[in-house]
Amino acid sequence: MATASVEQPDLTKVSILGKDSIHCGFHLSPYIADTVLTNLPASTYVLITDTRVAKFHLESFEAAFTDALAARPNTSARFLTHVIPPGETSKSREGKAEIEDFLLDNSCTRDTVVLALGGGVIGDLVGFVAATFMRGVRFVQIPTTLLAMVDSSVGGKTAIDTPHGKNLIGSFWQPSYVFIDAAFLETLPQREFVNGMAEVIKTAAIWNEDEFSMLEASAPALFAAIGSSSSTTSAGRTTATRSEAQSLLLHVITESIGVKAHIVTLDERETGLRNLVNFGHTIGHAIEAVLTPTILHGECVAIGMVLEGEVARQLGVLSQVGVGRITRALKAYGLPTSTKDPRIAAVPASRLLTIDRLLDIMKIDKKNSGPEKKIVLLSRIGKTYEERATGVKDEVIRRVLAEACRVIPGIPRGNPVRMSTPGSKSISNRALVLAALGNGTCRLRNLLHSDDTQVMMSALIELKGAKFAWEDGGETLVVSGGGGAFTIPPAGKELYLGNAGTAARFLTTVCTLVGPDSSSATASSEFPEGYTFITGNARMKQRPCGPLVDALRANGSKVKYIESEGCLPLHIGAGGLKGGTIQLAASVSSQYVSSILLCAPYARDEDVVLELVGGQVISQPYIDMTLAMMKTFGVEVTRRKAEDGTLLDIYDIPRAQYTNPEKYAIESDASSATYPLAVAAITGTTCTIENIGTSSLQGDAGFAVNVLKRMGCKVEQSENETTVTGPPIGQLKAIGLVDMETMTDAFLTAVVVAAVCGEGSAEGLESDVPKNTTRILGIANQRVKECNRIRAMIDELAKFGVKTKELDDGLEVYGQPIETLNKNVSVHCYDDHRVAMAFSVLATVVPGTILEEKRCVEKTWPNWWDDLTNKIGIDVEGIELAHQSPAVAKYNPEATIIIVGMRGAGKTHIGGIAAASLGWKFIDADHVFEGRTGELVSQYVRSKGWTAFRQAESQIIQDLLAENPTRTIISTGGGIVESPLNRALLSGYGRATGPVVYVMRDVNEILSYLGSETARPAYGEEIADVYWRREPWFREVSTHEYISYTGGFHAANGATPGEIASACRDETARFFRQITGIKPNLSEALAQGERSFFLSLTYPDLLPAVPSIPLLTAGADAIELRVDLLNPSGDPVTGPPNIPSLDFVATQLSALRHTSSLPVVFTVRTASQGGAFPDTAEKEAFALYNLALRHGVEYIDVEISWSDKKIQDLAARKGASQIIASWHDWSGNMKWNGAVVKEKYALAERVGDIVKIVGKALSIEDNFALRAFAAAHTSKPFIGINMGAEGQLSRVLNTAFTPVSHPLLPTRAAPGQMSVQDIHTALHLNGQLAPQKFYLFGSPIAHSMSPHLHNTGFEKLGLPHKYHIFETATITDEVKAVIRAPEFGGASVTIPLKLDIIPLLDEVSPEAKAIGAVNTIIPRKRADGSTSLFGTNTDWRAIHDLARNNLVVGITNETTALVLGAGGTARAALYAIHALGIKTIYLFNRTRAAAQALADTFPTFGIIPLDSLNSFPKAAPTVVVSAIPATGTTTEKASDSAGVYLPPSLFEAPSGVVVEMAYKPAVTPVLGLAAKSSGWVGVRGVDILCEQGFYQYEAWTGRKAPRAAMKAKVISLYDSQQ
């Protein structure tokens, strides 16, 4: 048979199962056609691909097969093509059937050959079709992605997905050929290439260390290979035309394939050895199951490899070297290595990555046998621990997955402990710079494998300043120095340094040495020779580098701040370091000094003379360390001396070249050594640290002798070892004054040990200082480390009950006995490794201590927790913290917030509430100004003028931000924006570091307030003029806006002062928690996948409707503000175009905020999609969206028809807000099984956190099609509904954020919209909402109002449930049966069963345990479908909230409360008042002993039992709770009653709230007395009954209670009985 003359490509063939069937090369289309037609004769050849691949490659294959068939005139074979939709959704039973139908329709028979052209989905799906069609036909794999090339196409695994999981139905069916055309990768998006590199790295990690080492060094070359274009030239088809990069790429692919092919040949059906290719997949697949399809397979496996490496490290079978190398290699290719990676955190589903969820998914893994999870463990790079997956216990995996950990106190099992610490961070970073600058090769031993050294190495590689390789299994780093030659990175490439301060400071000067390149893409008039861009994370952008930059600029280097003055990021001009005299301020960081010293020998023009100025030099030992290391690398620095021999702070550095020593051993880290030594000290055991002794270069090596020995430890130190033996537990002694200037990083360890030191020496202290004092000085620089460490230690020690005092240069710690420390403390670690490790020392003796951010130790001791367990012998368990927002935050969530606004706007009031709600510190800048200057602002302005005041004000703001970079709210003076310097400072802060909030208030209210205010300086002009001048500046510098409502509109609607104040507090707390992302106000029901609704408001003006909002929102989870329907005239909007003003929308939004705490859905609906907003007004629409972000709106509905760039920009700035990406088709043309809806969904899924697609139902079948579509698209919450009457069924069946209306609304927002009541009724009628039975247990209860309360609530929301009375005074078998019945929905419990019911429950809330009573039973579904019974107490919440809501004045440290009574209700009252934050609680009972006994059960509540109500030890109470029957109290002093006399002095405070727990009569003595006291508000017992019932109702139903209707029913009956 004649064949075409096909140019034979140069191939690499890989054997599998005894056949050379895997052919690898470039540009293979003609070769593939010829080979298939020649070697696989058939009547029909069918090529199947997807639409995405078809665009790039289908035409060339059609041409190749057409030509090949034409060259074979004797053949009658057909060549058919079939194109299917792309993506995982095609890999289904339906997708398989569609291909099979195509084959059958085209009369394909058993001799057909099927070709799969595409990625893994195509290969898996088409392979399974081939395996089953006609009982098996031949097929060919032609993978087009790197992932498919090296993984899914090799080995014969084929499968489809089902709703139960991926690849659950399939077969082993080997392809006849696998053709690997590496030229395909040129058309692959970089992310897809990187996705495949994860599998390549995995294969090398389990099998071949040499290949792994090559991958570590080859990332730039491999990216260059796929970045080149050879498609037009066919370059690479033959070796003669193949570039070096192409050869490398083909080598990488074939080597990876070769390993898998070898393993498959030995174990085709995956009985053991083939499990090895699943390294990273056990955990990776679990992550993928949650995040698919947004996060790719390789990205999930990359995270899985790191985590499974950590599992092996924890089990002691893999060193940190191995984990570090895997992490570095993955990062080199841009793969995520943690679930905290911003790309992962940006996915809404990432909130579902809980430990229990991942462990549950891991149960279903084909590698498992029995309950144990099977994980492939590495023993080193290139070698697995076993030749199969190894069984691992859940607690081991849990500890690795957990973000936090709990240290279990005890005596170290390893006592006496002998260990070494990781390599010194300080020496490791210096050695890397020196070896890179030097000539020759240097082998570094004991290098620290951590985040810090990784970013240093990555930066040096990007600068092409050195080459790195590994020897001895990764124990030795081989550095080939570049002799000081550095190259500008490509344009757009930034050197990202994370929070690595050492790397940032050293590299700042290194980058000045970069060679000039006027042709660089970075060259400009400002930087004619190009520049390097260095940056870091949010905290790094707060850490100072100003003194170093000032010194470099003064020496002629070009350095530019890009955001905040004095901090990264920087543009650093190329061209060299000039040299000569350099003056440097070294009182903040010795790293500035070392940075210049290290680079000075490479000065361009003259020798460097480095002169240190500005006061005492900090951390001199670290400068000495740098000098010693420079000498080792061949350059000796001379430090000048005075005539008397005193050393001066002047250094002469000659111009020279470093000569790399052949080997350099890095000392162990002395700062890290302090932790195990301190564990020995605090637990009374012995620890020896190797490689740290008197000969150490590091100042922290003196910690044991200078601190622990003085505290009472036995210390032995040789040149190379340090041994500490602690005294018996509890016998450490305070040491008075200790100067730690030479070992500043060790101060945190000293602080936690000092916290448990008893009375000792007061050496160096004043005579009146307590003898349990340890005063630590010389550590001021620790305020500008990874966090403000001095403040961090003070704040966290306070949680343990340890008292401290902050000093200018340090702090004092007042030690106390271990047993008196608070237990179960959760320590916030500030993402600071030293904070975490220091508190882990204290945790060894304080039970229940949780370290919230355990991974921050990876900066210097990545395996600290493993070593703490395995080497020291203190157990650590993984803890999952309560979930916080996964949203991408522009800032560190704990970045300090600046408040700006006019004088009189309420900045101080709002700031104080905000700080209290976040648990942060509040600072009024004006008060700080007065404290520092000793003058009132008005006095200062009068004496020195406004200009001087503005300058001083600017400096104070800068100081406050430097001193308080996190967890602080700073309120500024109204005129701060008058200064251009301040405006630049505030704008830069808001762009890069943290929120700047503009507190707004109606201008007329401000004018009225300031007209009567005299304490502050006069403006010298009209206040209104000042306001209108500043107002645009406030908007310019701010990132967010908060409207300070005075409550005028609330008062007009009958709200009490207490309710107005409460609304302000609630909204302030919501706003600041939302914009920080610390506790976003998002719908829990939506997040948890439960049924949820939002109410669509259609009012043109909300203000008149404010009183109706609580009624309208019953049952809703959020409120939709239809911005396009707003109209300041109050007239309904009749149609487009309608563009409401920003100010009007802001006012409406704020009114809504102060009326309801529900999340807001901010919607601007265009005319084409059913609204009134013009489709062409994109600029105006995004101005409104920006307003929503500035006001902290929770959900923003964004139509995907707007321009993609605008949407992407909005998404990048959304913070904790979520985007509902929406599309509405009013025509009815969109079909739920068509291509258009898939296209719209894919677009919406890419940009939105929630997807909303609305169609129009023309028949009832359209609802079923929608249902099927929704079932297949579950990666994100999906709102899918059909409009019109025929579409109402879709609203009933939709579960996520169904838009609902209410009968009281003026119009419905869309045709067919239903109420919550309508939907519940329909669900019940369709069998989707089963009726449940609820009960009240207790006796006597015949006249209880609870049935009326709850049954009214069920009726109003259309719920088919019933609430019954079950009268009983004992727990009977019938009660036991009722609460375990399938229809049991929940129960209220009253006397006498509140305690007796507890043994029947599976779990009891902490508050119910503390109160000692359960009044509510809530059934909860477990993961396995069974039911657990949860008991809680809602009485305390009712007391808490009604007291809080009626307090006019906020709670301060001086606020007091009074509880009358000492029974069970009094316990709930005490718990509620303590939860309010009131620190002094008076307790009165007729029997004082009973009061004292009750007080003793709550020793931390600040309870003071009273003998009389006539006077109070402190301030009079502003909250009074009466837990005494009404008959037991009287206001008649001369009464013969045995009741408690209530004197008028009870209510002597000017305002307050009294809560009466007695149900009858309506007006009790205490309420009557309060009614006579101006400013006091009374809460009746019936109000408490209703309030606690609302919480029960919402806990049982998951729906917001229709409070107004429920309460109206109860009050009506109650009043009729009086």
From Swiss-Prot:
Keywords: Amino-acid biosynthesis, Aromatic amino acid biosynthesis, ATP-binding, Cytoplasm, Kinase, Lyase, Metal-binding, Multifunctional enzyme, NADP, Nucleotide-binding, Oxidoreductase, Transferase, Zinc. GO terms for cellular component: cytoplasm. Coiled coil: none annotated. It is found in: Cytoplasm. The active site is at E270 (proton acceptor), H285 (proton acceptor), C856 (for epsp synthase activity), H1224 (proton acceptor), K1252 (schiff-base intermediate with substrate). Residues 407-874 are annotated as: EPSP synthase. ATP binds at G901, M902, R903, G904, A905, G906, K907, T908. Zn(2+) binds at E199, H281, H297. Residues 894-1096 are annotated as: Shikimate kinase. Residues 1-394 are annotated as: 3-dehydroquinate synthase. GO terms for biological process: amino acid biosynthetic process; aromatic amino acid family biosynthetic process; chorismate biosynthetic process. Residues 1097-1318 are annotated as: 3-dehydroquinase. Pathway: Metabolic intermediate biosynthesis; chorismate biosynthesis; chorismate from D-erythrose 4-phosphate and phosphoenolpyruvate: step 2/7; Metabolic intermediate biosynthesis; chorismate biosynthesis; chorismate from D-erythrose 4-phosphate and phosphoenolpyruvate: step 3/7; Metabolic intermediate biosynthesis; chorismate biosynthesis; chorismate from D-erythrose 4-phosphate and phosphoenolpyruvate: step 4/7; Metabolic intermediate biosynthesis; chorismate biosynthesis; chorismate from D-erythrose 4-phosphate and phosphoenolpyruvate: step 5/7. Pfam families: DHQ_synthase (PF01761), DHQS_C (PF24621), DHquinase_I (PF01487), EPSP_synthase (PF00275), SDH_C (PF18317), Shikimate_DH (PF01488), Shikimate_dh_N (PF08501), SKI (PF01202). It catalyses: 7-phospho-2-dehydro-3-deoxy-D-arabino-heptonate = 3-dehydroquinate + phosphate; 3-dehydroquinate = 3-dehydroshikimate + H2O; shikimate + NADP(+) = 3-dehydroshikimate + NADPH + H(+); shikimate + ATP = 3-phosphoshikimate + ADP + H(+). Its EC number is 4.2.3.4, 2.5.1.19, 2.7.1.71, 4.2.1.10. Its main location: cytoplasm. 7-phospho-2-dehydro-3-deoxy-D-arabino-heptonate binds at residues 135, 151, 157, 167, 199-202, 260, 274-278, 281, 297, 366. It comes from the Eukaryota. GO terms for molecular function: 3-dehydroquinate dehydratase activity; 3-dehydroquinate synthase activity; 3-phosphoshikimate 1-carboxyvinyltransferase activity; ATP binding; metal ion binding; shikimate 3-dehydrogenase (NADP+) activity; shikimate kinase activity. PROSITE patterns: EPSP_SYNTHASE_1 (PS00104), EPSP_SYNTHASE_2 (PS00885), SHIKIMATE_KINASE (PS01128). The AROM polypeptide catalyzes 5 consecutive enzymatic reactions in prechorismate polyaromatic amino acid biosynthesis. This is Pentafunctional AROM polypeptide.
